[in-house]
Each structure stands twice: as structure tokens, then as C-alpha cells.
A protein has these predicted regions:
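Generic N-terminal amphipathic, Lys/Arg-enriched alpha-helix
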Residues: 1-8, 12-33
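N-terminal capping/small domains of soluble enzymes
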Residues: 20-51, 55-57, 62-75, 84-91, ...
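Glycine-rich tight-turn/loop motif centered on a GG-T
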Residues: 22-34, 118-124, 158-165, 200-208
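Alpha-helix-loop-beta-strand connector modules within alpha/beta enzyme cores
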Residues: 42-52, 101-106, 174, 209-223
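Active-site-proximal beta-alpha core segment in soluble small-molecule metabolic enzymes
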Residues: 55-198
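Active-site loop/helix belt of alpha/beta enzymes
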Residues: 153-270
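Active-site loop ensemble at the mouth of alpha/beta enzyme cores that anchors a bound cofactor
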Residues: 238-316
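C-terminal accessory subdomain/extension
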Residues: 289-396
């Protein structure tokens, strides 16, 4: 779905990965990150967010919590990072990244609370008084932690398993109780998703969750609370920032916006350019169909099922001219291989380049950040696993 836009807007990335793979510098089963384009995307998002009075906290899980990317994104103007869980927080902290937001979507387990406190996140979201008390109990004397309340109202939208929080109608009482806990300072509100892609209009629209947190903010202001942070994640990129800022949002958390892989980026030219591909290799044939190594063939299902195609070849021009449909294993199966439709142009050892919306952290793929693509001098900045740890590839 994203391959067409990748070829139109960043064909240099395809050229680079084919050459690097054929030169044995990057492995099969690898997400390749175009660092130059990611930096460009983050700069424009940071500039727009700051212009609109908002903080920019990018999400890094979908690019494998990669430490090289963390450092590049922070230098490009991000105010910190949202950490979806403690695994995110550890990798980002180790890479020298500032933790802007923790506890949303995944709350911090009790045994890890002290470790999280030591990382000093700027904001920490809680779903209950019990989780707030765990933070309060773990705080050293004199350390203040700003906490956000995850809230919900009837009719709000959630992915299955993401539900939870405080009832929105109780928000004034919630804020007062959180403020009263030793070391805690009530700072604001969070929900997810506050935006989703609408297939009918092919645009991003706010969910009811968005109105829930904005109405709760009004109640808090009527009760005398000021400087209320509003965290509004979900399908976020710079084209939404002006309206969100005017509505009162103070924190945005682009993930796929950073790599140009939100649903709208697949359909039209947005400010952010594509900056990520999945690379594999043809390894064998069976009944005239080519098989390519899997491991990272998880496609985040933001669209209904669609025909998946890839560029295949041993040099860039050949690969860009040889676009072949590939059958990806069902998510219920282990993706040992992708199976291509019959095409006489495909050869064993050919590079395979896919363009799809990835979630590297749920796969067993490598993650390879590459600098210098924009200048025509691509350089591999290391080969990492999908949890952000550097590997010794091709050795152990």
C-alpha cells in the first residue's frame, strides 16, 4: 500500500537498500530506516508543533526502539519521547533520550516503579489511584512527579485491551486526590485514540475521546485548575497540529507520522516523506514461485486486506521495474517466508523491498539505520534487533 509513494517520493531509499543488501552490508529480514528523511520529518513536525504551542513526543516502538534513531530524533527537535511500556523506556533512557511521557498505553508494573521513577519522566499517566500511590510511595523525598489522568466516557473508542482509566465525570475529584498524594502533581489528561483514519472520507478524524478530554479540561478550569496538559495521540502528523493546538492540545505523539507511514501518507503527498522499508532476499523456488525470508512480515492492519507487492532485483533499476505480488502469511502463522506470485524475472539472491506499515517491536526482524541516503553516500549505522540492542551481525 505504501510502496507506490515510496517509489514516487523516496526512490533513493530503495536504490540505497538494494545496493547495500547486494554488498552484504545489511541482512535479509531487516527494517531499514532512512535517517536523513526521519530527521527532516521530525524537524518539520517539531517546528509546527512548537509554533502551535505543543510539545512533540515521538513514539519509537514501531522502528524498534532504535538508539541511533532516538539520538537523531532528539537532535532534530523532539521534546522527549512517549514510551509505550517499560521496555521502551529502558531503551530510550539508555540511548540518552528524554522520557516525555510514560504509563500510556501500558502502565508501569509495580516492581518496576522505582526504576521508572529514577528515569524522571516529564509526565506519567495513571489509570487508577492504586497505580498513582505506587508512584507516590516510590518517590524519594523532595522529588515531584507530574501525573496525567487517563479518562473515559460512555461512547469513547478503544482498541480491544486498551480500555481503562477514571470516569470523566469524576475528573475534578480525581485531580484533587492525585494532587493530595505525597510527591504527585496533577498535570493533565490523556486518552487514546483521539484520532483515527476514516476509510470513507480517507481523512483523519477525531474520535469522541478527543471531545471527552477537552470537555474534562473545561470542568477542571471551572474548578480553578490551570496549565492543564492535554495529551491527544493517534494517527498524528503535522497536518493536524494547527487545529489541535487551537483546541487546547499541548502534547502530540507522532509514530508513523515520523516515517511517513500513516494511512493518509499512503494515499496522498503529505509534508512527511516515506522513511522506512522492509528488506528481504529471495532464497529458493517451489513450483516456480519464489520464496523470500520472513521474520518481519507483520503488516499493521490499518487498511482492509490489500494486494501486497514488493520490488525484486539485484540492482536498483531492475528492482524498481520488477514489482511482484507476494502472499504474506496470516498473522496467526509464523512468517518464515513470503511467497511471490510466479515471475520469470526473479532470481535467487535478489533483494526484496517492501513498503508497508510496520511495528518492528512485535517482530524478530533486524533494524538497520542508514545515514547519507539524501547525499548519495549511504552508510550503515549498525545492525540492531527489534528491541533496540546492537547485534554482531553477521556473526553472533
Amino acid at each position: 500500500m505504501f510502496l507506490k509513494k515510496i517509489l514516487e517520493r523516496n526512490s533513493a531509499m530503495v536504490d540505497a537498500v538494494v545496493r547495500l543488501h547486494q554488498a552484504n552490508q545489511i541482512p535479509a529480514n531487516a527494517y531499514v530506516l532512512d535517517l536523513d528523511t526521519i530527521i527532516e520529518n521530525v524537524r518539520l513536525m517539531a517546528d509546527k508543533a512548537h509554533e502551535c504551542g505543543m510539545k512533540l513526543y515521538p513514539m519509537m516502538k514501531q522502528i524498534g526502539r532504535n538508539p541511533v534513531a532516538v539520538q537523531a530524533v532528539q537532535k532534530a527537535g523532539a521534546d522527549g519521547f512517549v514510551c509505550v511500556d517499560m521496555a521502551d523506556a529502558r531503551r530510550i533512557h539508555e540511548a540518552g533520550g528524554k522520557i516525555g511521557h510514560l504509563g500510556h498505553l501500558v502502565q508501569v508494573p509495580k516492581a518496576e516503579t522505582a526504576a521508572a521513577v529514577a528515569m524522571k519522566p516529564a509526565y506519567w499517566t495513571v489509570y487508577s489511584y492504586e497505580k498513582a500511590k505506587e508512584i507516590s510511595d516510590a518517590l524519594p523525598a523532595g522529588q515531584i512527579q507530574k501525573v496525567m489522568a487517563r479518562i473515559y466516557a460512555k461512547g469513547d473508542t478503544y482498541y480491544t485491551g486498551h480500555e481503562g482509566g477514571f470516569p470523566a465525570e469524576d475528573i475534578v475529584e480525581v485531580a484533587k486526590k492525585l494532587d493530595a498524594m505525597p510527591g504527585l502533581q496533577f498535570a493533565g489528561l490523556a486518552s487514546f485514540p483521539t484520532q483515527l483514519f476514516d476509510e470513507t472520507s480517507e481523512t483523519v478524524k477525531h474520535t469522541q475521546n478527543y471531545q471527552t478530554i477537552l470537555k474534562a479540561k473545561e470542568k477542571l478550569e471551572e474548578a480553578g485548575f490551570t496549565d492543564i496538559e492535554i495529551n491527544a495521540p493517534g494517527t498524528t502528523s503535522s497536518h493536524l497540529f494547527e487545529e489541535m493546538g487551537k483546541s487546547g492540545v499541548t502534547q502530540v505523539e507522532p509514530g508513523h507520522g515520523m516515517t511517513g507511514t500513516t494511512p493518509v501518507h499512503a494515499l496522498r503527498d503529505m509534508a512527511e516523506k516515506p522513511a522506512m522499508v522492509y528488506v528481504s532476499e529471495i532464497c529458493h523456488f517451489y513450483q516456480n514461485r519464489a520464496y523470500a525470508y520472513g521474520g518481519g512480515m507483520y503488516i499493521d492492519p490499518v487498511f482492509p486486506p490489500y494486494k501486497v507487492c514488493a520490488c525484486v532485483g539485484s540492482d536498483p533499476d531492475e528492482a524498481k521495474q520488477t514489482i511482484v505480488e507476494c502472499d504474506i502469511p496470516n498473522p496467526a502463522a509464523i512468517d518464515y517466508y513470503g511467497i511471490f506470485h510466479e515471475d520469470v524475472r526473479i532470481k535467487t539472491g535478489d533483494t526484496v523491498v517492501f513498503g508497508f506499515r510496520a511495528q518492528a517491536f512485535v517482530t524478530r526482524a533486524y533494524v538497520v539505520p542508514v545515514s547519507g541516503i539524501a547525499s548519495g553516500k549511504p552508510h550503515v549505522e549498525g545492525v540492531f534487533d527489534s528491541d533496540g540492542k546492537k547485534t554482531g551481525w553477521p556473526s553472533c
